[in-house]
Amino acid sequence: MTDRIPLKRALISVSDKTGLVDFARALSARGVEILSTGGTAKTLREAGLSVVDVADVTGFPEMMDGRVKTLHPVVHGGLLALRDNDEHMAAAKSHRIGMIDLLVVNLYPFEATVAKGAAYDDCIENIDIGGPAMIRAAAKNHAFVTVVVDVQDYAAVLAELDANDDRTGLAFRQRQAQIAYARTAAYDAAVSTWMAGAIGEETPRRRSFSGQLAQSLRYGENPHQSAAFYRDGSDRPGVATARQWQGKELSYNNINDTDAAFELVAEFDPAEGPAVAIIKHANPCGVARGDSAVDAYLRAFDCDRTSAFGGIIALNTTLDGETAQAITEIFTEVVIAPDATDEAKEIFAAKKNLRLLTTGGLPDPAAPGLAFRQVAGGFLVQGRDNGRILRADLKVVTKRQPTDQELADLLFAWTVAKHVKSNAIVYARDLATVGIGAGQMSRVDSTRIGKRKSEDMAEALGLAQALTIGSSVASDAFFPFADGVEALAAAGARAVIQPGGSMRDAEVIEAADRLGLAMVFTGQRHFRH
C-alpha cells in the first residue's frame, strides 16, 4: 500500500461553507484542480476561484431539485479505483474516468433541521444521499483517497500537505477515513432515531447512538480508567451545553455529579422561589427552597455540612454575589446555575480551582427522553423518569390527614427522593431536607441513617433536638414491613409519603395510625440505581 499520495484533483461539495473559500484557495495554490456542485461551485466562483462543474465531467446535469448530481459512475469510479490495479486503471481510461484524490463533503444539515422542529417533509428533504455515498466510497479507498467531512480538519489537511511535499500519508488518510465513517454512522443514526419518533416506534429493531467528542478526560471514575466526554447534540440545558467561566477542566466525576445536581434542582420551578441542591457521589446531601438564593443554599448546607465539603452545588436561579460569598466559605468543586451576576463571578475569581458553569436555562423535568445503562453484552433503554405527583394525585390512607405544611413538605421530599439512590428516605421540614438516607439494601437502614445524620447535624449546630422531630418523610418505594414506619416515628416524623402497593400495606397503615402518623400513597415509584 502506497504511503504518500499526491493531491492533484479534489471534489468539494459542502453545506457548511465555513472556511471553504480559504481552504479551496490554498488547494488551488498547490495546483489542485477543483470539481464542485451547485451552491459550493457558485461560492467558489464568486471568490474568483477556477472550478469545474461535476455535471461537465459526468456529462449528466443535476436533476430532480438536486437530488441527483453526484450519483454517477464517473464520480464513484474516480473515488473507488485502485491506482495500483491495472484492470481498474484500464477501465477508468476506457470510460474516461479521472481520479479524485481528495473528497471534501459535509452533509445536509439534517440534525439542525430536526432540532428546530421542521415539518416532516422538510426533514426528509434534508436527508443527504449523494454525500454519504461519496464519503463511504472515499473512506473505503483511503489507500489512495483523502476524505474530509468536518471543517475543523481543513487546517490539518493543509498542515499534512506542507509536511509531505503536497502529499498525504497513509496514517493521515486512515485517520480521516475513521472520522468519515463515524460521521456517516452518526448521520444515519440521527435519521433512524428521528424516523422512529416520527412513526411512534418506541422499541425499534435496532437502536444507534452517536456523540461528538467534547473533552478527553484525564481519567474516569478512578485514575486507572480512561475516559472521555461526548455530546449527543441535544439542546437540553445542563453540563453538556454549559459555559465554564473559570476553574480546572471538569473531571469524569465532576460531570456526573453536576448533571445529577442540575437535573434535581430543575424540578423546582424558579417562579415559586429559589432552590439549591448540594450533591456528592450523585446523591443529594442537602436540598432546600428559600426566600432567596442564599437562604436556600444555607438551609441546604445545614442538612449535612460534613458531606457538603467538596460537593457540587446547583441553583435553579441566578447565582448572586451574596450566595457566591457564602459558598466560598467551604471547598466546593463545581457550581452550576442558569446564570451568574458579575459580582458572583468576581467573588469566585479568587477561587482558582472552583468551576463555575452557567447554562442559560433549566432542563424541562417533564420532557420525554431516554436513559441508558450498559450491561454485559447489551444495554438497557428506558424512558426518563419524569413522573410528577400533584396534591390531587395523593391518596390519604390513614386516619389523620396531613396538614397543609406537611403536604407541602411531603411533595418536596418526594421530589428529592426521586433523585436519591435507592433505597431512598428523605426527611424534610419547611421545604428543606433535614436528613437523607441513601443507597442502602434495607429500607429501614436508610431510615435510620437519615435520622442519625440529622442528629449529628443538630449536635454540630447546637440544637436541642434533631430536625427530624416534626418532619415529613418520603420513601422512593413502598415499605415492605411496618418496621420502616416505626423507625420513622422513632425519629420524630409526623407524615409519610410513599407509593404503596406492598402486600403488607394494611399492616403499615395500621402502624401509622397507631403511631399518629399521616400517610399518603402516590401510586408511583421512583427507584434509582
Swiss-Prot record:
Belongs to the PurH family. GO terms for cellular component: cytosol. The IMP cyclohydrolase activity resides in the N-terminal region. It holds the Pfam family AICARFT_IMPCHas. PANTHER family: BIFUNCTIONAL PURINE BIOSYNTHESIS PROTEIN ATIC, BIFUNCTIONAL PURINE BIOSYNTHESIS PROTEIN PURH. GO terms for molecular function: IMP cyclohydrolase activity; phosphoribosylaminoimidazolecarboxamide formyltransferase activity. Its EC number is 2.1.2.3, 3.5.4.10. Keywords: Hydrolase, Multifunctional enzyme, Purine biosynthesis, Transferase. It comes from Paracoccus denitrificans (strain Pd 1222). This is Bifunctional purine biosynthesis protein PurH. It catalyses: (6R)-10-formyltetrahydrofolate + 5-amino-1-(5-phospho-beta-D-ribosyl)imidazole-4-carboxamide = 5-formamido-1-(5-phospho-D-ribosyl)imidazole-4-carboxamide + (6S)-5,6,7,8-tetrahydrofolate; IMP + H2O = 5-formamido-1-(5-phospho-D-ribosyl)imidazole-4-carboxamide. Residues 3-149 form the MGS-like domain. InterPro entries: AICAR_Tfase_dup_dom_sf, Cytidine_deaminase-like, MGS-like_dom, MGS-like_dom_sf, PurH-like. Coiled coil: none annotated.
